[in-house]
Amino acid sequence: MLTDGSQHTYQNGETKNSKEHERKCDESAHLQDNSQTTHKKKEKKNSKEKHGIKHSESEHLQDDISQRVTGKGRRRNSKGTPKKLRFNRPRILEDGKKPRNPATTRLRTISNKRRKKDIDSEDEVIPELATPTKESFPKRRKNEKIKRSVARTLNFKQEIVLSCLEFDKICGPIFPRGKKRTTTRRRYDFLCFLLPMPVWKKQSRRSKRRKNMVRWARIASSSKLLEETLPLIVSHPTINGQADASLHIDDTLVRHVVSKQTKKSANNVIEHLNRQITYQKDHGLSSLADVPLHIEDTLIKSASSVLSERPIKKTKDIAKLIKDMGRLKINKKVTTMIKADKKLVTAKVNLDPETIKEWDVLMVNDSPSRSYDDKETEAKWKKEREIFQTRIDLFINRMHRLQGNRKFKQWKGSVVDSVVGVFLTQNTTDYLSSNAFMSVAAKFPVDAREGLSYYIEEPQDAKSSECIILSDESISKVEDHENTAKRKNEKTGIIEDEIVDWNNLRRMYTKEGSRPEMHMDSVNWSDVRLSGQNVLETTIKKRGQFRILSERILKFLNDEVNQNGNIDLEWLRNAPSHLVKRYLLEIEGIGLKSAECVRLLGLKHHAFPVDTNVGRIAVRLGLVPLEPLPNGVQMHQLFEYPSMDSIQKYLWPRLCKLPQETLYELHYQMITFGKVFCTKTIPNCNACPMKSECKYFASAYVSSKVLLESPEEKMHEPNTFMNAHSQDVAVDMTSNINLVEECVSSGCSDQAICYKPLVEFPSSPRAEIPESTDIEDVPFMNLYQSYASVPKIDFDLDALKKSVEDALVISGRMSSSDEEISKALVIPTPENACIPIKPPRKMKYYNRLRTEHVVYVLPDNHELLHDFERRKLDDPSPYLLAIWQPGETSSSFVPPKKKCSSDGSKLCKIKNCSYCWTIREQNSNIFRGTILIPCRTAMRGAFPLNGTYFQTNEVFADHETSLNPIVFRRELCKGLEKRALYCGSTVTSIFKLLDTRRIELCFWTGFLCLRAFDRKQRDPKELVRRLHTPPDERGPKFMSDDDI
């Protein structure tokens, strides 16, 4: 140990008598006990005298420290046996108290085990100062051996490093490698997990375990302080090079574990250091590291903090940093920072002042007939409207050939049905919205026995009036009322009257007498209003946004009752169109698009609503001009389309002169076209009949690498079909799909997509329809056309070349050589005018979006339809029969297979064994089947918005026969016509990436099925797995026990 600048060593061969050694140990122990007793007795009388005695005792015991540390001078207890010493860390004293002499403190061992000391080696012993509080160690177990703690010996030439381990469970100085540190054995009391324990006990135990980290953090801060202030006192005579040899500070100390620093000047730092040096001289310590620390030492500001601080960064740097960080986003799942998606470009409609002026005039008068002051302006609008009419006629003509006839056909329903219907159509698909309305109609049915009292009941004001029939006088009053003050609607910017007496207008336009049957309500809206919001929310919960929609619907119904006394809006059919528009816009939750839907589809007004499908199609077909896209974005790269209101502002001034029937068919065809072909993502451009006039297709065609390929190169592989489902199905029970559709040939498809075959079951000879038919079958027979009568769609190559040239100009490729452009524009056949479609990872996924079946067409007088409602004469679809395969169950989504080893002599009882059930059905001469109901017949011809939710060839699967099939004789299927049935979740998923011919045949000769229908409860159901299983619900884990 270092004492007064000298080093104590033991020479080789020097020995001592054991008795003399024990005597000295007893004397030192006795002297220390006496010193402590004298210290306690004289503490109150004379502090100076106490300090002198203490100082003399420390000098006397200084020489014996090394002996006690090495274990040669152990203290003995009353029995004479050596007593184990306790060693503690340095004490941290409070302000105003003097530290204890380090020579009188008891030392603490650092190493784990006692090591034999070599006599020839030179060792240095590092004493450690006592802590102010006693540490309580856990009690040892009876069978546990007592471990001895000895002093840690270090080679003098090794470097002493004082540092702290941040957030370590065992904190302390970093010792040289190869030496182990002592660790306190932790005992975990598992009773604390069962019994409640006070918080203060837990905190006290943790504080005892981690007390060393706080001490050594302060020692590290003091060492850092010495390192920074040594240049200020380098000339001090008591600090020599020999004493500084052991003072090596680690530069990598952690600073943020040090307690908060106070603001002091550099003079206070030097003055405090001088006090420490004086203490070192008075007590004869070897270095400043041996001086005990005070609490105030940790609060002194270091010398580095006295120096001038760095200037604060400028605001621009901070703003730049914020901007850079703003481009990053945190992924909560991965907890990593990734680049944010690029900001999507939103297109804007190029609205000229003349269009905006014409729009404002039409919103005020709502009449297309007006006179222009300038003949040139009138001629300009007339020319533009003629051009638009030509393009609209072309679109309707092609869509009629592909998607069938969609002209206006009246459905039953009231105005209230349509208003609630547009509430349910907002921000969702037609499938979910139609299901929601069907659920409401099933929950609150109309009681036909109570009759027309609810519908015919007139308000008291109307009964007391002398006449409620429209006359010239009443109409003139309305015209005078319309010339009052105007105001601007915040929703649409329409100039409107400030005050309108709706009660007076309602009495004026309400017709006398009963309401016709076509305008009856489909739902008992009075019961809906009285049921409460919770009941309505539960009814439409599957639709989504049920809380907001239920609140709006009930508010609308309550407002009608509060204002008019009943729920009746049939007077809007007779009111002027501009007043109807204003009345609808004043309903909370009804916007311009919803109001136009009610007017066009429910009231047959002259209007044209623009929804997401219509707006996207109008932009892609070039009906609406756009402002130049920034950053070189092409049309096919556009994701965010202009707002629907801006598109309607451009379209309506040019469509206002078209007839109402044309506007209805145009809207209906556009809605279906947007679901089948022109979808938002992955549109089916290669099968689209409008690709020759499409700006989107031309842009994608120019940007693709296929542009400069030779015509001989094939873009897509021909369509291929697989064989039958399974070898277990007999060959005579299956037939090729070409008996049902003419799309089997490999050259009919432009895309490389594999389709599963349609299984025709059972196989029966095709019989001709008898010539003599009943009068009931006449409309049924006229509905269906032969395959040869399906119209063929023309392809305009000249229009496509013109679109490609325009796309080349926009993309900037016209600067290329004329040879390259001529090669690009060589399109000999429509089949080569295709764009590459990135194939999906799993081609089977698109195949599983639809399930194809072969069904039989049932006449209206068929024996199997006795328990079903009579088909509506104006329903374009018939009843259908889907046959079950032998061994098939309602939950089967894979073809049945043979499950037993029977040879036919003895049949098994397994439900899904195709072999045994085929023999049973053949021996019994029976079939099992499911009935499919036409949608118009299932809804009894009543649905809001004139039934535009459904497709013209849509059918519902009977839920009862889907679970428990009907069993009938095989003779009942003879002579029935076979058709194709496409089942799926939505119309978009069914037609995903189908070729043009198959889509055309599906609309003209096939049928669609999206849902099942419960005839008793009259509410929609999901299709059973046998008819269709979504891709996400396929696999072994979804199979039932019968299918395994």
Curated annotation (Swiss-Prot):
Residues 16-30, 54-66 have a biased composition (Basic and acidic residues). Belongs to the DNA glycosylase family. DEMETER subfamily. It is an enzyme of class 3 (hydrolase). Potential transcriptional activator that may act by nicking the target promoter. Catalyzes the release of 5-methylcytosine (5-meC) from DNA by a glycosylase/lyase mechanism. The DEMETER domain, which is present in proteins of the subfamily, is related to the J-domain, but lacks some important conserved residues. Residues 1-15 have a biased composition (Polar residues). Residues 1-107, 1024-1044 are annotated as: Disordered. Although strongly related to DNA glycosylase proteins, it differs from these proteins. The DNA repair function may not exist. The lineage of its organism: Eukaryota, Viridiplantae, Streptophyta, Embryophyta, Tracheophyta. Residues 348-445 are annotated as: DEMETER. One of its GO terms (cellular component) is nucleus. This is DEMETER-like protein 3. Binds 1 [4Fe-4S] cluster. The cluster does not appear to play a role in catalysis, but is probably involved in the proper positioning of the enzyme along the DNA strand. One of its GO terms (molecular function) is metal ion binding.
